[in-house]
Curated annotation (Swiss-Prot):
PROSITE patterns noted in UniProt: RAB
Name of the protein in its database record: Ras-related protein RabK2
Chain segments annotated as coiled-coil in the UniProt record: none
Lineage of source species: Eukaryota, Amoebozoa, Evosea, Eumycetozoa, Dictyostelia
GTP-binding is among the record's keywords: yes
Predominant place of localization: membrane
InterPro entries cross-referenced by the UniProt entry: P-loop_NTPase (IPR027417), Small_GTPase (IPR001806)
Protein location: Cell membrane
Its membrane topology: Lipid-anchor
Binding site for GTP: 11-15, 63-66
Encoding gene per record: rabK2
Record-stated family: Belongs to the small GTPase superfamily. Rab family.
Lipid group attachment sites (S-geranylgeranyl cysteine): 145
A GO-annotated cellular component: lysosome
Highest rank taxon of the organism: Eukaryota
């Protein structure tokens, strides 16, 4: 296996890549983020999930955990129900990892990133195991004199 593989993170901001499945083709880990205080942000998760190929492992990140939850915030129970529903429907091949993060307080940022990298590397290794490497070496000329 090539030890020098590249991992790329795309931050779509919900716009430039919208409905462009080409950017999500052959990904090793999907990362979906939403604001835990914004209903529309949470509701958009289904749309973003639909852009990925089936059986892509996912990490779900709820942002702005430094802000106190209100009655309008998305409850942890509701988030867990959403994850379970996606898992039960077979849309993902393994359990969705969920982190509540705060960029302001640096809460769970490193833990989430390490999980994303671990999942992506495992997925990459599995793809390498299941692939066939075909290489054809060019034939050397025979019986030709070069002056």
């Amino acid at each position: 296996m090539d030890n020098n593989n590249n991992k790329k993170l795309f931050n779509t901001h919900g716009s430039a890549f919208d409905d462009s499945k080409i950017y999500f083709r052959d990904v090793d880990c999907g990362v979906l983020c939403f604001n835990i205080h914004n209903e529309q942000s949470f509701n958009n998760l289904n749309h973003w999930m639909s852009l990925f190929n089936e059986n892509v492992p996912f990490v779900l990140i709820g942002t702005k955990s430094d802000i106190e939850r209100t009655e309008k915030s998305i409850s942890k129970e509701r988030i867990e129900q959403w994850c379970k529903q996606i898992e039960d429907q077979g849309i993902v091949k393994e359990k969705i990892h969920y982190f509540e993060t705060s960029a302001k307080l640096s809460t769970n940022i490193i833990e989430a990133y390490e999980t994303i990298v671990k999942i992506a590397l495992n997925q990459y290794k599995n793809k390498q195991k299941n692939s066939i490497n075909i290489s054809i070496e060019p034939e050397k000329p025979k019986g030709i004199c070069w002056w």
